[in-house]
Amino acid sequence: MPIAREQPPLDLDLAFFHWLAGPHVTGAAGDEALVLDELARLVRDPQTASTLVPRVPAVIPQVLRSLRSDAASSADLARQVAQDAVLVAEVLREVNSPYYQPGTPVRNLEGALLLLGQNGLRMLLARVAFRRIISLQTSRLARLVSPQLWNQSEKCAQAASLLAPRHGADPFEAYLAGLMHNVGLVVALRVIDGLLPAGGLPDSDAFGLRLVHAARLVSAGIAGQWELPPAIGHAIAHLGDAATVSTSLPAALGQADCLAKLHMLAGGGQPAFVAAVAALPVGLRQVYDTFNETDNADRQDA
């Protein structure tokens, strides 16, 4: 997605692809058509695509449904989350980290709810669940780039939830869309690992753009398989479409995706990206600056 600046515009999708892929292009490029044809097949067959990544825990769609119920209580939310013991353990470990700074150790979900509130617990729950999906990869290439992909996903989700109210979108749906939008890219990396020799990742501009587009459609299809709200899949499928830049959730997700990619690219100090950060409008710069606060908290946690 281009970002407005002096000519020529920056294409952050393409720049991020090259930044992600560059260290892993070590040999002759493999067959681009082979990869793109397989991704096109997975776009048409989201059920098969969804088997290439761990499934989102069943509690996530349940939590989403409870959001639409006026009768849903904190106790209902705690009961839903308690169905997944592994998820509960990860949530409690996370909520006791320096990032959240609890005054006393939190030992159960009720304590986490008191500290975070319902919306805060929902977001933490989603973050823990999707981190497992993106980070626990066995294929070589997906495993190597998963830390960067998770970093971008987490930042995109954070920004999308902050931008959602400005666009009339639901903050939690925006947060989930940010976490979900790179899942198709994980699938694409697994496809590349299965079809091409090590080091054979193609890195042409044309391939990068087509891969990113196909991966988004795969993400959207998997979101449907996982029973996430249709608005999430729609927003992901239309990321970067000019016709949706001013419409609710797609607009919030599009801006968030750009900000998250820009933050990671600007971290390398390249003048073009640093200048793009300096040119951000005030409202977007405020959201961008929250990434630094989160990174600082994560370093303290480490």
Where are these regions (language model features)?
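Catalytic or ion-translocation cores adjacent to nucleophile or general acid/base/metal-coordination motifs
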Residues: 198
